[in-house]
Amino acid sequence: MTNIRKSHPLMKIVNNAFIDLPAPSNISSWWNFGSLLGICLILQILTGLFLAMHYTSDTTTAFSSVTHICRDVNYGWIIRYMHANGASMFFICLYMHVGRGLYYGSYTFLETWNIGVILLLTVMATAFMGYVLPWGQMSFWGATVITNLLSAIPYIGTNLVEWIWGGFSVDKATLTRFFAFHFILPFIIMAIAMVHLLFLHETGSNNPTGISSDVDKIPFHPYYTIKDILGALLLILALMLLVLFAPDLLGDPDNYTPANPLNTPPHIKPEWYFLFAYAILRSIPNKLGGVLALAFSILILALIPLLHTSKQRSMMFRPLSQCLFWALVADLLTLTWIGGQPVEHPYITIGQLASILYFLLILVLMPTAGTVENKLLKW
């Protein structure tokens, strides 16, 4: 009799993806973030579902409905803070996952990488719309500033912005549609993530050396299932420490003030995970130029496979490229810091230099380093 795990049409799919999957024997903890992202997504969908049961997407009641969730709903406060801080954990895992892909050359799996870039953009859009829903000051002004950037598009800009707003300013129509999109997008993300996984399993995982591991595979279960469970426990530990001890650490105090179109907060800034892109946007004095730089700062990821010049896949044995990679990480941290600072000297100059360095590292220095390393190895 054949094993049901291997013969049942549905169980067979699960088996081939999570149980009998041949995996490289040497993948490190940097390969844990894929499963952690899956856990984050499920957690966000579940907490979000319970929040949606008590939330009202109307400008007059949105703020008080969130207050009601925190004060009157059973365990509403923990659900709300798990959802808000879960987004932060989601982005930490996302950036680690992308960084791993850059470092170890995983971007040579073109379909998997490009779908990953689409996933990143979709998650960013979802998080942005979610931040608008509590209808605090930063929600309202963040929505106003970011949607208003589209008005920089020549000819159709103004019409486009008013079409997105559903009026002449961010108002009830905007909040309602943002709630609708924020609800549906995570399910779309889940579907795209399945395609991401499908394409990954066509080629199999990369590994730290960047060398084919076909000669040395081990079954996913029990080795990597137990490893993923450990990662999941650490993720939940970190999330719950944040939720129970410092729930507002990563939030903005301005968002505890109800949205007021007549009063602009002194410093409009997005959540911490968008600050690097926000700093690049602000570093260019021209509106359209800033918008293009902002878009390109994320879309540049799609160009990474074309910019790979080295004859080695991974950076494991390429010290020159390693130095530049960590310079890029430091540069992104600098941009994140600058994005949260007011627009004044010396922050403006630091932001401009960090923005130039960001594009210089990716477009010029790293491809050059790859070529130099080939020459040094007489390849």
Curated annotation (Swiss-Prot):
| Co-factor(s) | heme b
GO molecular function annotations of the record:
metal ion binding; ubiquinol-cytochrome-c reductase activity
Q: Name one GO biological process term.
A: mitochondrial electron transport, ubiquinol to cytochrome c
State where a ubiquinone binds: H201
| GO cellular component terms listed in the entry, alphabetical order | mitochondrial inner membrane; respiratory chain complex III
Entry membrane topology? Multi-pass membrane protein
Describe the function of this protein.
Component of the ubiquinol-cytochrome c reductase complex (complex III or cytochrome b-c1 complex) that is part of the mitochondrial respiratory chain. The b-c1 complex mediates electron transfer from ubiquinol to cytochrome c. Contributes to the generation of a proton gradient across the mitochondrial membrane that is then used for ATP synthesis.
Question: What else is on record for this protein?
Answer: Heme 1 (or BL or b562) is low-potential and absorbs at about 562 nm, and heme 2 (or BH or b566) is high-potential and absorbs at about 566 nm.
How does this chain assemble? The cytochrome bc1 complex contains 11 subunits: 3 respiratory subunits (MT-CYB, CYC1 and UQCRFS1), 2 core proteins (UQCRC1 and UQCRC2) and 6 low-molecular weight proteins (UQCRH/QCR6, UQCRB/QCR7, UQCRQ/QCR8, UQCR10/QCR9, UQCR11/QCR10 and a cleavage product of UQCRFS1). This cytochrome bc1 complex then forms a dimer.
Protein name, please? Answer: Cytochrome b
**Name of the encoding gene:** MT-CYB
